[in-house]
Structure formats: C-alpha cells, structure tokens
Regions:
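Predominant activation on well-ordered alpha-helical scaffold segments within soluble catalytic domains
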Residues: 9, 38, 114-117, 121, ...
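Acidic-glycine-rich active-site phosphate/pyrophosphate-binding loop
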Residues: 83-97, 160, 175-186
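Short coil/turn motifs at secondary-structure junctions
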Residues: 80-82, 141-143, 190, 262-264
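Acidic/His- and Gly-rich active-site-bordering loop/insert found
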Residues: 1-101, 106, 125-130
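Acidic/histidine-rich catalytic neighborhood of metal-dependent amide-processing enzymes
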Residues: 109-182
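Short glycine-aspartate micro-motif
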Residues: 72-74, 101, 161-165, 184
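Glycine/serine-rich anion-binding loops at beta->alpha junctions
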Residues: 99-115, 193
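Metal-dependent amide/peptide-bond hydrolase catalytic core
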Residues: 43, 49-54, 175, 182-273
C-alpha cells in the first residue's frame, strides 16, 4: 500500500454497514474492519487487542509502542457506516472521480480514519520516543446507540487526556457537541373493527396526542436552553409504528424520538417538568 488514497480505498471496500435496524446487513463488517486495522498497525509496534461490547462486534484497541507511564491521547474514529439504502452509486467501489473518492464511509469516518492511520505509519519510528503516547481505537456501533464508545469510556476513560474523534467537520476543529438521548414512547389501546371504532381505543390517536404534547410543551422547554456554538436543544420524532390494516382500530403504537441537549439543559434538568 503506497499512499493514504490507496488506504482509504481499501477501507471503503470493506463493507461495514451498522447492522442495527438494517435487516439483511452482515454483522461481520465491523469485525473485518478491526482485523484489517490490526494487521496494519501491529507491524508498526502497536499492541493490538479487541473488546466486544456486543458479540462478534469488537472495538479495535491499538496501544502505541513505548513507555506505558506516559500521558496518552486517543485517535478514535468508528468502524461502522450508515446504510447504503437509496445510494445512486456503487457504495463500495471507492472510485476516484472529479477529484473525489466515492463510496459509503468515505467521509464518515473512513476518510479521517485513513488520515490517522497513515499519519501513524509515517511517524512510526518516532512514536515510542514521544512524550505522549498516541493510541488508536476503532469503535463499533457509532451509527446506532454507540455501545462501542460507551463500553470503552466505562473501562478506559481515565487513561486519556483527550480524544480526537475524526468526524467530518469541513476541516474545522470541533471541541463540543450536543448530548443525545433516544427514547421510545408506546401507547396501548383496544382493537376492534373500524366500522365500530367507539368500541375500541385507538392507540395511534393516543400516541399522536402525546407526541403533540411532547413537542409543544417539552420541546418548548428544550429551546430555552442554548449554546453559543451548538444552538438550542432539539427534539425530533424520527419513527412511528402502529396498526396492521386500515379497517382495524390499532391496539398498539410506538414512536422513536431523538433529543439533543446542550450543556445548560443537563445542568438545569431539575427544572424541567
């Protein structure tokens, strides 16, 4: 492998779509990514280990060569990508066209990952002598509920001074981000034939009423909390499920919501009704 471009193309050609909520996707993509990265970094002197927050889906941990008693920083991109559904190009071709590399994950985050890995390769002879150890971790599951980074933080957070995540940010340094909460709201009703809806209890209608209240009342409280860089806290209703047929009053309905919070919201959450 002769260049960072070739490295990025190789990474893109390893399909690693997050399998959560994407039926039919192979759950082995993150493992394949971890195996490749381990083979890339081990000859450079890195100590390679894997930890599995979920079965068969590892975090790849590479500790830099040199003294263990140094302060440590972390390069931490993620192994998985979002779905390829709806793409109009071959998702894993890594074709170079119009001065760009095309493919799923080319920017999020296999592009930054390739830059990090190539930087470690080019500086391999000096890594053991640096005053600070530069470790690399490839996180699994970032595009869903982030079990990889959560597991790593629980077991290793106190080992590091800071981390560079490598998300695509138009080459601007980003030092803060919104917090994230995913929640599911469920409504229970009573099923009956649609010709006599008064005999049932429509779960979708109950859910809709609750979602309206949530957006209007709780959403209004969220927007009171702002940050000079991040803007306001937000809420989004991202997915709704309910019912089986149009002529049946639904007895179950659910919605998945995404809440993004700024620091002042977390600091003052005791004041939220």
């Amino acid at each position: 492998m002769n260049s960072v471009i070739e490295l990025l193309q190789t990474l893109i050609r390893i399909p690693s779509v997050n399998p959560d909520g994407d039926p039919g996707v192979s759950p082995e993509g993150e493992y394949a990514m971890a195996a490749f990265i381990g083979e890339f970094l081990e000859p450079l002197g890195f100590k390679i280990t894997q930890e599995e927050p979920l079965p068969g889906r590892p975090n790849l941990i590479a500790r830099a060569p040199g003294p263990e008693n140094r302060q440590r920083i972390l390069l931490g991109p993620h192994l998985d990508t979002v779905s390829i559904a709806g793409m109009s190009i071959e998702p894993f071709s890594a074709e170079i066209k119009d001065g760009k590399i095309w493919g799923r994950g080319s920017s999020d985050t296999k592009g930054p990952m390739a830059a990090m890995l190539w930087g470690l390769k080019e500086n391999a002879a000096n890594l053991a002598n640096l005053p600070i150890a530069v470790d690399f971790v490839g996180f699994m599951g970032e595009e869903s509920s982030q079990p990889g980074s959560q597991h790593f933080a629980q077991h290793h957070a106190d080992e590091y001074e800071f981390a560079i995540a490598g998300e695509p940010t138009s080459l601007e340094a980003v030092y803060c981000t919104k917090g994230c909460l995913w929640a599911t709201i469920e409504a229970q009703g009573r099923s009956t034939h649609a010709s006599q809806p008064h005999l049932g209890d429509n779960a979708i209608m109950k859910l809709t009423e609750e979602l309206n209240r949530l957006v209007n009342d709780f959403g209004g409280q969220l927007t009171k909390h702002s940050h000079q860089v991040l803007g306001t806290s937000t809420i989004n209703i991202g997915k709704i499920k309910g019912g089986n047929r149009a002529n049946i009053v639904p007895d179950k309905a659910s919605a998945e919501i995404d809440i993004r919070t700024v620091p002042s919201f977390v600091e003052n959450q005791s004041g939220i009704d």
